[in-house]
Regions:
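Conserved beta-strand hairpin/beta-sheet module of binuclear metal-dependent hydrolase folds
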Residues: 28-83, 194-206
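Active-site metal-binding motif and surrounding structural segment of the metallo-beta-lactamase
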Residues: 34, 57, 68-118
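Accessory terminal helices/loops
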Residues: 1-22, 138, 238, 251-440
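Metallo-beta-lactamase
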Residues: 59-60, 66-68, 127-184, 228-240, ...
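Hydrophobic/aromatic beta-strand patches that form the interior of the parallel beta-sheet core
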Residues: 42, 90, 120, 165-167, ...
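Binuclear metal-dependent hydrolase catalytic cores
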Residues: 2-10, 104-155
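Divalent metal-coordination and catalytic microenvironments
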Residues: 40, 53, 63, 93, ...
Length: 440
């Protein structure tokens, strides 16, 4: 028999669990398990977590999951409270794994002639939905890479359930005998909402807490807000919550544990941003910054702060982008020649493709996969149809994927390996023609 959600939460708090593979917080590893984890509170765990709160006068959903979970969520909620209407939902932010699960609840309301659930969200959420509608191709490509999704099977959604009521800083509503306090914070997104229900001492942080190093650096996504994130975590820690419903992964039970998890996460974020800004204030290049910022040792063994999704170096890059813009400080990167042209020049200087491939293979054999990656990319850029170059590229990136804990890094490397197996650099790109340009 599978462990209950509460039992799994206890195991993972004590460091007795596999958050890299078996119970990764951003993967459907619990087979859409649902459980009443506190009186009147059902938690559904899949890629993202959803909770339903029974107010005594209807249900309130805290997030709604993705479209891929919508039927399962509906069935679990209906099995738990078959006669209770879903009257409201709170979107913690605009990401599609949190906002696309209301369809059957809306349809149920329509069929019975009552109002649809009222959706609460931050005032910036609709703008993000409109951004998504303008960038469906881009978001399909980057998520295919990030999650290892087959391009032929994954499409980015182009319709969204827009909120009915939005707020700017704080909003409180009551339902039944319960109070839902909505607070704005900036973190993974600029439209984050964390919710506190004081009567239950119940905290819903959304993706401000995900049982991992925060998703504060994601290499393909829009700006994250590291210092603001830390502020929101400390504000949540001050609530005195006894149950925290993580945006991904498992709940945390007990006020002391919740305070520890939130403040440790805030301290980690503060450390990364402080170190990054100290180096930036010396006027150094991004290359120095990403290789000199370190994660303090005191966080190394905390089970809820492992780099199983994002990576600390990605967070450093995001801090740089927020305070320093897109330029990395290297003058030749300001108005560069196309990469394929650069690669061809370097390969020629090195004595040709075969010599570069031989050196890349030796580096890989010696365990220097980072440098091997740089060299093999030059060969594929210089001669895109070179079979041996793609064969070596496949091998190098397969090895890089296996050596990383971060699933973002693993999946991006694995995507490159799969592409080279098919003689391509990128399976998600629908146009792989090399860039050509003249200097203006």
């Amino acid at each position: 028999m599978a462990d209950s959600i509460r039992a799994l939460a206890e195991r993972h708090w004590n460091g007795d669990g596999d958050l890299v593979h078996e119970h990764h917080p951003v993967a459907p590893v619990l087979d859409r398990q649902a459980e009443e984890i506190a009186p009147g509170v059902l938690t559904f765990v899949s890629i993202a977590s959803v909770s339903a709160v029974d107010t005594g006068d209807g249900l309130v959903l805290l997030d709604t999951g993705g479209s891929f979970d919508a039927d399962h969520l509906y069935d679990q909620v209906r099995a738990w409270r078959p006669g209770s209407n879903v009257d409201a939902a709170v979107f913690s932010h605009h990401h599609v794994d949190h906002v696309l699960g209301l369809g059957r609840f809306d349809a149920e309301a329509d069929e019975s002639g009552r109002d649809r659930p009222v959706v609460y969200a931050h005032a910036d959420t609709p703008d993000h939905f409109r951004r998504y509608e303008r960038t469906t191709g881009w978001n399909a490509a980057i998520n295919q890479r990030q999650f290892g999704l087959p391009p032929e099977l994954f499409r980015w959604p182009d319709t969204y359930r827009y909120p009915d009521l939005t707020y700017r800083n704080e909003l409180t509503f009551t339902k039944g005998g319960l109070t839902f306090e909505l607070h704005h914070g900036r973190g993974e997104t600029d439209d984050a909402t964390w919710t506190y229900v004081p009567e239950l001492r119940l905290l819903h942080p959304g993706d401000l807490f995900i049982w991992a190093i925060p998703n504060a650096g994601n290499p393909q996504k829009v700006q994250r807000y590291v210092s603001d994130w830390a502020d929101a975590l400390r504000a949540m820690a001050a609530t005195g919550a006894e149950v925290m419903l993580s945006g991904h992964g498992l709940p945390i039970f007990g006020a002391e544990r919740i305070v520890a998890a939130l403040t440790d996460t805030a301290d980690l974020l503060d450390s990364i941003e402080r170190q990054t800004l100290e180096l930036m204030n010396l006027g150094v290049t991004l290359d120095r910054v990403i290789h000199e910022v370190t994660v303090p040792e005191r966080f190394a063994d905390l089970p809820y702060l492992q780099p199983v999704y994002d990576h600390p170096q990605f967070i450093v890059r995001n801090v740089w982008r927020r305070y320093g813009g897109w330029h990395d400080g290297e003058p030749d990167h300001l108005l560069p020649a196309p990469r394929a042209q650069q690669a061809a020049e370097w390969v020629e200087l090195a004595g040709g493709i075969d010599r570069v491939l031989a050196r890349a293979a030796r580096l890989a054999d010696d365990g220097d996969l980072r440098m091997a990656s740089h060299l093999v990319e030059h060969t594929v850029l210089a001669a895109g149809d070179h079979a041996m170059a793609h064969e070596l590229r496949t091998s190098i990136y397969q090895r890089r994927a296996t050596e990383h804990v971060s699933s973002m890094a693993r999946n991006l490397f694995a995507h490159a390996a799969r592409a080279s197996e098919q003689g391509r650099r990128d399976l998600a790109a629908r146009d792989e023609r090399p860039s050509t340009s003249r200097e203006n």
